[in-house]
């Protein structure tokens, strides 16, 4: 059999984690201080976003990971009136949210393994779920963001990688200050993360859709497939 041109790696181990801060820039590793967070001309995001940053004092964690579950129990500064639903109770009385900025932002770091031959290919990250607002950085550059605690998302990182043997640093800033549900929701990378490398001509994430139509005489299955060409040359392919 022919080997698949696509490689998928589960990013479960090797992560480092540290709490940031939702309102104190010093305790949030300088994030956003210089107002050039999204500058294209050069990376200027946060100290923790760069490969040279020393994260040896950070916690070692496995992903999936939820930092809220380890937080102490607490009441907010202004408890809910008795006649209204107690959202704090529904969320497990965890010390997270707008009343607890010191517990509501988390930073994750992970070095990525990149092969020199991947320069002509495409590499992206697949996140099955991060709670909640997630900023994805590669080598100090903001490459994507997602503002949902439950929707999966993908980020193409190909154009920000070092293919000459240098370090490639993945960094995530996750802000769980705002919730979505009436129930305990947690905080952090609570579902799987995958690193995918594929040929420049490939079926993108969610590029295959299967539908079935049934009737008295039987069923008809239809499959539609999207093909993306992220290379610089025209390509002829067969599906």
Predicted regions located by residue number:
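Beta-strand-rich binding/interaction modules
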Residues: 136-138, 219-239
């Amino acid at each position: 059999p022919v080997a698949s041109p696509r490689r998928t790696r589960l990013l479960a181990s090797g992560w480092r984690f540290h709490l940031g801060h939702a309102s104190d820039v010093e305790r949030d590793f300088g994030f956003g201080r210089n107002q050039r967070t999204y500058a294209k001309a050069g990376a200027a995001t946060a100290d923790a976003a760069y490969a040279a940053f020393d994260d040896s004092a950070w916690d070692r964690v496995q992903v999936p990971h939820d930092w809220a579950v380890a937080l102490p129990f607490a009441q907010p500064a202004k408890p809910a009136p008795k006649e209204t639903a107690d959202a704090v109770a529904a969320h497990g009385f965890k010390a997270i949210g707008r009343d607890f900025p010191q517990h509501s932002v988390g930073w994750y770091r992970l070095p990525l393994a990149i092969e020199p031959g991947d320069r002509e290919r495409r590499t992206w990250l697949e996140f099955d779920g991060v709670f909640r607002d997630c900023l994805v950085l590669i080598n100090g550059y903001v490459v994507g963001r997602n503002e949902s605690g439950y929707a999966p998302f993908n980020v193409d990182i190909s154009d920000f990688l070092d293919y000459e043997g240098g370090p490639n640093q993945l960094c995530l800033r996750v802000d769980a200050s705002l919730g979505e549900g009436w129930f305990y929701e947690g905080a952090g990378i609570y579902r799987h993360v995958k690193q995918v490398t594929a040929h420049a001509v490939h079926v993108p994430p969610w590029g295959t859709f299967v539908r079935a139509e049934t009737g008295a005489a039987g069923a008809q299955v239809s499959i539609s497939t999207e093909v993306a060409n992220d290379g610089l040359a025209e390509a002829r392919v067969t599906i």
